[in-house]
Amino acid sequence: MGRRYFGTDGIRGTVGEAPITPDFVLRLGYAAGKVLAGTADVAAGARPTVLIGKDTRVSGYMLEAALEAGFSAAGVDVMLAGPMPTPGVAYLTRALRLSAGVVISASHNPYQDNGIKFFSADGNKLPDETEAAIEAWLDKPLECASSDRLGKARRLEDAAGRYIEFCKSTFPAAYDLRGLKLVIDCAHGAAYQIAPHVFHELGADVIPIGVAPNGFNINDGVGATAPDALVRAVRANHADLGIALDGDADRLQVVDSTGRLYNGDELLYVLVKDRIATAGKVDGAVGTLMTNLAVEVALQREGVPFVRAAVGDRYVLEQLRERGWQLGAEGSGHILSLDRHSTGDGIVSALLVLAALKRSDRTLAQMLDGVTLFPQKLINVRMKPGADWKGSASIRAAIDAAEGALAGSGRVLIRASGTEPVLRVMVEAQQAADATRHAEAIADAVRIATS
């Protein structure tokens, strides 16, 4: 039986619509608390404690209170971190030896949305079986713990300071950021009180933007999903580099002094090159089905095995763990470095990139010399719900024709949307005209076969 509420990154939706309602979130806290209360540590007499962090959406107050009430009713103590990046909650949960961590955030989505995601005691996302157990408890009646067993709540006053020190600890002690002017865009999100301090305390001249949240402006024209604001600020301030985080600070985009934007694919290559220079070799790297072919080719030139996971940082993480590798990324800016953190961390990833530039005494453009991203053409084709596009001979013929013409110098990727009756047709080629021509030919075949 499939999961009803948990997606690939927790539970997410529009606030006020199921399941992101205060009554459901209270029951979710209770259900998660009952699952935690059944662990071996609790059975041995320890009282479970969870950490709750959130981003800056106005709905965070309501959902935080609902979660807190649910955990308390289940006999679970709560620590409240306040605004805290998702990776900060993961780190603090592990560092404080807590039973679990909870993040109230919808990441890069607008303020009208929100979500709940959980971390296990070791700072990793919950395994499927634990999420299934929580969903099973949601069907049971809420039976409040007796008064002497109710959970207590308190604020973790030094949460931000602890996480700032952790982030700084991932930057090599032999270097600092003195002499660098950095624009830091916090998306009016969870990192607005944290990220500027990290880079400033390492010596950088920091120009912060996106640091005035009002509950309604998270990701609104700023942050990693709207990098134009960062480009403008870098140019206007003659900065050396710009770093944009998203609402919960688990992803980033980077802009150099010329205004050139670097995505997660390119930053992955930079980090691999840095590891080769410092460690001698890299066992392998993981991207996704959408990772630009030019990066795969460049990694092959360096002798680094490359594996493509399904789209989503959860799947990149699965592949890294399965192979015992350290480095992975999505083009959207989720970067994983498992020897630094258990989850994607925009601030830590930025520090890794800055360390690579310091060690090499080169710019990003210089480190990526010879790596030119292949043009990609993406066409979304609407089709009838339930249309059998996989069984269409004409679509298969169009794909085969494109792949034959590209002959190893490009890629064709066809995948269905998970939320609407749309087929996404992506073609990547060395020449933009070739990518467009083949994508349009396949899209035409899809329209004819599925309309």
Swiss-Prot record:
Matches recorded under Pfam families: PGM_PMM_I (PF02878), PGM_PMM_II (PF02879), PGM_PMM_III (PF02880), PGM_PMM_IV (PF00408)
CDD domains membership: GlmM
Cofactor annotation: Mg(2+)
Keywords: Isomerase, Magnesium, Metal-binding, Phosphoprotein
SUPFAM superfamilies: Phosphoglucomutase, C-terminal domain, Phosphoglucomutase, first 3 domains
Cofactor annotation remark: Binds 1 Mg(2+) ion per subunit.
Post-translational modification: Activated by phosphorylation.
An example Gene Ontology biological process: carbohydrate metabolic process
Superkingdom of origin: Bacteria
GO cellular component: cytosol
EC number, as in UniProt: 5.4.2.10
InterPro entries assigned to the protein according to its UniProt record, in alphabetical order: A-D-PHexomutase_a/b/a-I (IPR005844), A-D-PHexomutase_a/b/a-I/II/III (IPR016055), A-D-PHexomutase_a/b/a-II (IPR005845), A-D-PHexomutase_a/b/a-III (IPR005846), A-D-PHexomutase_C (IPR005843), A-D-PHexomutase_C_sf (IPR036900), A-D-PHexomutase_CS (IPR016066), Alpha-D-phosphohexomutase_SF (IPR005841)
PROSITE patterns hit by this protein: PGM_PMM
Modification sites for Phosphoserine: S107
Annotated positions binding Mg(2+): S107, D246, D248, D250
EC main group: isomerase
A single GO molecular function term of this UniProt record: phosphoglucosamine mutase activity
Reactions this protein catalyses: alpha-D-glucosamine 1-phosphate = D-glucosamine 6-phosphate
Enzyme active site: S107 (phosphoserine intermediate)
HAMAP family, sorted: GlmM_B
Family membership: Belongs to the phosphohexose mutase family.
Function statement: Catalyzes the conversion of glucosamine-6-phosphate to glucosamine-1-phosphate.
Protein name, as recorded: Phosphoglucosamine mutase
UniProt source species: Burkholderia ambifaria (strain MC40-6)
